[in-house]
Every structure is written in C-alpha cells, then in structure tokens.
Design a protein with these regions (language model features):
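Juxtamembrane/disordered regions of integral membrane proteins
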Residues: 1-239
Length: 239
C-alpha cells in the first residue's frame, strides 16, 4: 500500500464530498433552520427571555451569517473524518466487495456504511430542527445518539467477521444484526423532548437532512472509487 497516495485520495474524497454536503445544506437545509429559529425567537420574545429590538436582530443576523459561512468548513471537516474511516474500511474490504469496478465497490460499501452509521441511528433518533429540544438535554441527546451509532457500527463489524467465518447459512448474520439492533432500539432511551412545533417543519427538515447526508455518502463513494481506480494505491510496484 502506498501510504501517501492512500491518505491523499481518502482525505481528498472525503473533503470534496463534505464540501458538496455543506453546499447542499446551505441551499436546502438552511431555509428550514431559518423557519425553526424564527419560531424559537418568537417564543423567547413571548416568554420575556429576549427583547424584539434592532440590536437583537443585528446580532442574530451576524450570527446566522457566520453559521451559514461555516457550513462549508463543517462539511469539509465531516468529510475528512468520515472519509478517512470510509477509506480505511474500503482498503480492508475492497477485495471482498462484489464487482470488478472500484466505483461500484465503493458505492456498495458507502451504502452499507450509510445504513449502519446514519440511517439506522436516524430511525431511532431522527434529526430535529433547533426549535425542538431543551438546552438541558443537549448532552444527554448527544451522548445517547453517539452511543447508538457506536453500537450499530461495532455490531456491524462483529457480524461482518462472523459472515466471513461462516460457510453456510450466511443469511443468519443479517438476521443476527437485525435482532441485535432491534434489542438496542428497545433498550436505548427515547428522545426526552416532546415536539411542540409544526410537524410539517419537523418532517421537512428530517427529509431534507436525510437527502443531503445520503448525497454525501454517494458522492464520497463515487470520488473515492474513481480516485482509487486512477491512483491504484494498493498496486504492488514492479521490480
């Protein structure tokens, strides 16, 4: 394995996919965030926690501009971290993945990691706009979500090793993983915060968030597969 070439392509693929994710968030997700934050601001005014003044709106506008500008950077950071993990798993499992085409191989793995690290946790703890959730529960919600992602990820790794060792009835591995995650769904606590805002806003935010994250994994898979095909970091040098 050519270490430098490997690191360059996996990090580059992740960052590029992350930038696409950040741009999509600005275009598609930010309007929902604006609506949700607008509702939250009105609640603050009604409860006397903030005053509807020009100074408030100036500070709010400056903060939102800073947030939106940071979406690209946040996307790139997400891409660099998850892209590195994706690249490591791809390098390890590439020969075991079906197809002779590196792009198809990468897309297959991307779909698996999307399901394990995003979609299955999303079913238990779907994304909510800022107007949903109390400040006091942020740490609890973040920790339970991270734990569920870890359980899903490590569970998938464990059952993947079983899949390689089993010669017959490999479908039982998928049944086992599904059963394991079903138990985790029951054991793990639910989201503690009730939804007190429009479900149209919440569902729209969840759908668009899922679209942007799904796009991220697809783009990461395509770019990594294409770069791997071109660079061939695992090629053995000819003496």
């Amino acid at each position: 394995m050519k270490t430098i070439s490997f690191l360059v392509i996996v990090i580059s693929a992740g960052i590029l996919a992350g930038i696409v994710h950040g741009m999509l968030n600005i275009i598609l997700v930010e309007p929902y965030l604006d609506n949700a934050i607008g509702i939250e601001n009105q609640r603050l005014f009604a409860e006397g926690q903030a005053k509807d003044t020009p100074q408030f709106w100036q500070q709010f506008t400056d903060y939102r501009i800073w947030q939106k500008q940071g979406s690209i950077v946040a996307g790139a950071m997400l891409g660099a971290s998850t892209g590195a993990l994706f690249g490591l798993v791809f390098a390890y499992s590439r020969k075991s993945l079906p197809s002779d085409n590196d792009i198809k191989k990468a897309l297959i793995l991307a779909s698996i990691m999307w399901a394990v690290l995003y979609f299955i946790p999303f079913l238990k703890y779907p994304a909510n706009p800022p107007t949903v959730g109390e400040p006091d529960t942020i740490a609890f919600r973040a920790s339970t979500y991270a734990l569920f992602v870890a359980l899903s990820g490590f569970g998938a790794v464990g059952f993947a090793f079983l899949y390689k060792k089993m010669k017959n009835r490999k479908f039982l591995v998928f049944v086992g993983y599904a059963g394991f995650m079903g138990i985790m769904f029951v054991i793990m606590p639910p989201n503690p915060d009730p939804i007190g805002t429009s479900m149209d806003l919440v569902n729209g935010f969840r759908i668009i968030s899922a679209v942007t994250m799904t796009t991220y994994w697809i783009v990461n898979g395509v770019i990594l597969g294409w770069m791997w095909k071109k660079v061939k970091p695992d090629a053995v040098p000819v003496a």
